[in-house]
Amino acid sequence: MNGKYRGRGFGQGRFQSWKSGRGGRGFSGKWREREHRPDLNKATGKHPEQTPQSLLLQSTLDHFIPYKGWKLYFSEVYSDSIPFIEKIEAFESFFTERIELYDKDEIERKGSILVDFKELINDDEIIKLIPNIANELRDTPEKTLACMGLAIHQVLTKDLERHAAELQAQEGLSRNGETVVNVPHIHARVYNYEPLTQLKNVRANYYGKYIALRGTVVRVSNTKPLCTKMAFLCAACGEIQSLSLPDGKYNLPTKCPVPACRGKSFTALRSSPLTVTMDWQSIKIQELMSDDQREAGRIPRTIECELVHDLVDSCVPGDTVTITGVVKVSNAEEANSVSNNKGQKTKASEDGCKHGALMEFSLKDLYAIQEIQSEENLFKLIVNSLCPVIFGHELVKAGLALALFGGSQKYADDKNRIPIRGDPHVLVVGDPGLGKSQMLQAVCSVAPRGVYVCGNTTTTSGLTVTLSKDSSSGDFALEAGALVLGDQGICGIDEFDKMGNQHQALLEAMEQQSISLAKAGMVCSLPARTSIIAAANPVGGHYNKAKTVSENLKMGSALLSRFDLVFILLDTPNEDHDHLLSEHVIAIRAGKQRAVSSATVARMNSQDSNTSILEVVSDKPLSERLKVVPGETIDPIPHQLLRKYIGYSRQYVYPRLSTEAAQILQNFYLELRKQSQRLSSSPITTRQLESLIRLTEARARLELREEATKEDAEDIVEIMKYSMLGTYSDEFGNLDFERSQHGSGMSNRSAAKRFISALNKIAERTYNNLFQFHQLQQIAKELNIQVADFENFIGSLNDQGYLLKKGPKVYQLQTM
């Protein structure tokens, strides 16, 4: 007994106490008591006759508690003198008045009820019984929410018992005792809570307080079970007890509940009915940066939030949410409710009590929106309010304004159809110094939801979705990129030509409006319903009109064809335009509102007086109508108000095409098809027709109209023609329809075809597909192929895959 069993406490502890009855370690009391008192129950350590009496006493106490689910919400023993009994009675009367407004089956299924905070603080009964309800909810949220939960639990129990009694009375059944009604634990979810707390103000003094936050979801973890109560088995006497685990933190019991047992060793029973688990999820919220909250040089703050029970899976990365909950010390907030402010229905808004909205509008905002809509020439006002610092480029600004308003998405909720995107994409290409970046920043600033990124500092995962590993649990979680964060808004990408291989990540997001991810065993799809507005500089610093847009940007045709509008900005010298531009810049720098001087007005008026009356056209083109007439003053709409106007139109206006507008768009599309077939250029597809429809709907939405008219379609056709004029024209100013509509493909297409055909014949005849550079020059000279730069011509054939460079001045033909 000395060696093997001494360390296990057998020889000196348990064996000794059993044999002689003198105190072994940890077992002496119980064994001695059993030895001298054989009437004790060996399993529980209690008298056999005491057990049913104590159970009877306990059931009698439970019978006297007027609230059926008291133990589900409070650990205290019920007493009439408990101070929060009055609160429960007040909430009970509040819910009793509104019980018919709630879906009782839905409340039981989800285990939660939505409570409007504004209704709560304006209720007369609540004000009379709990005058400082707002302060009590803020300072003691757990007790107040538990009182609400118990009140609705009591109301539902009484209602179900009444229905059961009525049903029994109708069927003529005799009532043998009371009807047993089992209502689950119900959580009170408060929404519309005020005031909203900014993330920068969440400090230590908010610990344990009830607050409301608003932000963007940037990371969502997997759903896990969180243990709130664990059953433990005493190794000494076999007694089972249930221990509460606050916040899911594992803890062992300190003693056995049996008074006579002194056992200190316990085993966790994970499969016991007494073990209670709940769904748990962690999300990361990033603050929304509005104009009055921007802080230079500071990255946006984030906070971790925990979602439990029915709030799990109520949002995805990129959603804008309002979260109310209790601040905890572990740098996280336990959410009490999640209001997902998106167009789609979520867990928090399925009941119909609150449907998420993109923006909220006060009465003052609505009056301002009505005043803007009543303007006579609204399109001109909005175009000139977009970026007043940049002079001219009215049609480019018009295209950007239409992208801000966007068209209507079709079949978004129909699972049997593929949705058709309503967000137009715009690309602005041009020489440096023409204000592309300023226009892009202005658009992102005006948009209700805008994300601005720069192409040369952006990665593929930064644009789309990142799969990161959670440091605490080791699980993978999704972190949203720029396109997902710009969902139902604008994503502005500057330096678009310097993105490298990141272009491929945009293809799915631009057409399917979603981002699919398959990494580390996780396969999912996130919404990215955003308009992409990009600005790019051409290769070499200057736009070469002898090349196509694709050759100027080194960009594939698959990406270019997804842009609805491609604008080419060229820095061409023009005396009148340069004079106006210089005066505009000087006036802006001087801080004047009027950018055109009186001398310019006099000069322009003298020019207008010499114009023949025969040259005056009553129906001015759109480019003329959008220009500010000399002598005319325009008061631009402030960006803060314009943002509200755009948000209102995107939220409430869904225009449709009239018959005349559809006919104009169809005629223009058919004419494009006819030209593409006749001149063997790149095909015009239905993608161009959908672009025309989207932009026409945006033109009607800009004026808050439900129907797009004939004039809207004519304006869009003019903007589209202006866009195509830049992509089709060559270095001589002629329209080369052999180029594709969006400038993809090659310049000198017919010359390239003849050249490659001649190389094929020579290679077949000589059985050699390698050519020296001087040989290629000689062949081009014999074919009389006139190109401005022969090296660029061969380089474009190399880019298109016709020729492969095998060494210095040596090329291999790839089309044999």
From Swiss-Prot:
Could you tell me which species this protein originates from?
Answer: Bos taurus
State the EC number(s): 3.6.4.12
**GO CC entries:** chromosome; MCM complex; MCM8-MCM9 complex; nucleus
User: Keywords assigned by UniProt?
Assistant: ATP-binding, Cell cycle, Chromosome, DNA damage, DNA repair, DNA replication, DNA-binding, Helicase, Hydrolase, Nucleotide-binding, Nucleus, Phosphoprotein
Q: Which GO terms describe its biological process?
A: DNA damage response; DNA replication; double-strand break repair via homologous recombination; female gamete generation; male gamete generation
Record CDD domains = MCM8, MCM8_WHD
For this protein, what is any one GO molecular function term? helicase activity
What chemistry does it catalyse, as a reaction equation?
ATP + H2O = ADP + phosphate + H(+)
On whether Nucleus is a keyword of this UniProt record, the answer is: yes
By sequence similarity, the record places it as follows: Belongs to the MCM family.
Basic and acidic residues bias locations: 30-40
Q: Which residues carry this modification: Phosphoserine?
A: S606
Q: In which residues is ATP bound?
A: G430, D431, P432, G433, L434, G435, K436, S437
Subunit description: Component of the MCM8-MCM9 complex, which forms a hexamer composed of MCM8 and MCM9. Interacts with the DNA mismatch repair (MMR) complex composed at least of MSH2, MSH3, MSH6, PMS1 and MLH1. Interacts with RAD51; the interaction recruits RAD51 to DNA damage sites. Interacts with the MRN complex composed of MRE11, RAD50 and NBN/NBS1. Interacts with CDC6 and ORC2. Interacts with HROB; the interaction recruits the MCM8-MCM9 complex to DNA damage sites.
Tell me the PANTHER family matching this sequence.
DNA HELICASE MCM8, DNA REPLICATION LICENSING FACTOR MCM FAMILY MEMBER
Report the InterPro entries cross-referenced here. Answer: AAA+_ATPase (IPR003593), MCM (IPR031327), MCM8/REC_WHD (IPR056875), MCM_dom (IPR001208), MCM_lid (IPR041562), MCM_OB (IPR033762), NA-bd_OB-fold (IPR012340), P-loop_NTPase (IPR027417)
Would you tell me the protein name for this molecule? DNA helicase MCM8
Residue segments, region Disordered: 1-52
